[in-house]
């Protein structure tokens, strides 16, 4: 149907609505939202403003726009024609104002100047060109009143004037101007699709009432109401912040390989057939290989008190359990003279001369014969050695290897045990496979076979299974204290740990044990203000890079300890766990308000910023209930937190004021309508004279 036919249809009122206002206040988007049902994302709304005008000929060329222009307001069929205009003050809008039925005057609630121009420029211009045309004042961009202005300013074009908190106009500012001009006032948000129908339906009512005064014979206009009140907009609750856990740092694979090259805190020395020495660490070897686990476990059971008697000869006994056959060699009664163990509190300056170290090596006992237990080993004994990195003396387990164990493949084997990785370009794969067979490392042997068969892609699953077994063995060693070389004394007990694993997992521990601190030489380290349960959880995380699932302790205690050790990833994991537990309790109907209040400032103090943000969100979105139960606690919070509460509380203060004003004005209008209806009923009775015959 052609648009001209709307003018000819009986009882259809065609309304020409002109939309005016400053540039960039949202006139065109408001028109498009009504005429085309356009919805925009916040990114589109914040895009660079390009002055545009919505073309009036859309009603002629677009059937959908024409259909949407038709509506029924107060039982009156209407056809709404929207006229867009440029916001430049110097433009001539005389043609647009011609024969207009209503003018919608727009300003932005984020631009105080646009509201000032309503009084100083726009209203005067409207009354100059169409003095009898009704006007409706509209505050656009309502969503900016509750938006995150920092995010909004970041999303806008670089040279745009930033929107400040003081620029946002409260509803009463627009209402005061509307009252001064004697016109109705409404607010809209294209982003939230709020107020669009209110604005144009009430603009239509204003136009129809004005027309009714001139065309009083049109009976269908008698039911038209005066512009209605607009209920205030309740902004949606802000979504809770998502706890983001950063990418897990590497599980120490590269650091472990580096530790093999720079054997800090080494407690194993392999002696090859050509007297080449390779330092290593029991905990890495034992947790990666069952063969080495049996070897070092046998050593621990043979000499459980090695730390206190470095110079004593250790008698041999038959090892029963996991080993199959172990021959024991009796030592001579006149044992070799050994250098006593250094004082644990000695400083790093107490170094042993290299000649003395060589003398200890030359005079070392053959110890336990291992040739009958494994083809790869000859003997094992203990000595006090000088660490090549720290230059400090300490006990080491000296393992002499069989001449068949070549240096190159053995170093590759050790690197695999430390990192779980095998270089496909390794030269002596055959020698490595034979060595893996001798030491019963079947996963390494399979990986070598896959590489030789051009099927290296199959090694991924083997590597994954290797790391799972290693993690389980590490957790077992942590819980039992097996192969430990340091003990942490805490407020409520002690816990054993392993320096090599700590050095590779935590920079704080690496600085303490790898530097010149006295703790690097001590087997016992005192950590004040730490309980055993929290330290156990931190150590388990450092060993496995996972948070213990059976976490039965105060999250803030663990966060405080993780922050003390500079473990940001662990802090994020505990934050996520704490939020999950709080959310679960809230869903089950348990009040978490008091717990959240107690978490807030402690989380801020210990740099748990994500947990603090979640607590702030919970308090703000439940502000009324929290404040009613914990008013003193709310008032005791820091000034910054209280300012945040006031700014982000839900419902916001401006909404509560608007709701109160709306209810008050609504009651007043209902009283006026009731009085008006009584007045009309009295007038009807005054002109009604019933005759006795009719009665």
UniProtKB/Swiss-Prot annotation:
Keyword list, A-Z: GTP-binding, Nucleotide-binding, Repeat
Protein name: Rho-related BTB domain-containing protein 1
Annotated BTB domain residues: 266-426, 484-551
InterPro entries listed in its UniProt record: BTB/POZ_dom, P-loop_NTPase, SKP1/BTB/POZ_sf, Small_GTP-bd, Small_GTPase, Small_GTPase_Rho
NCBIfam families reported in the protein's UniProt record: small_GTP
Gene that encodes the chain: Rhobtb1
GO molecular function: GTP binding; GTPase activity
Taxonomic lineage of the native organism: Eukaryota, Metazoa, Chordata, Craniata, Vertebrata
Tissue: Highest expression in heart and testis.
GO term, biological process aspect, one: small GTPase-mediated signal transduction
Binding site for GTP: 21-28, 84-88, 140-143
Chain spans, region Disordered: 325-351
Region annotated Rho-like, chain positions: 1-210
Top-level lineage group: Eukaryota
Family membership: Belongs to the small GTPase superfamily. Rho family.
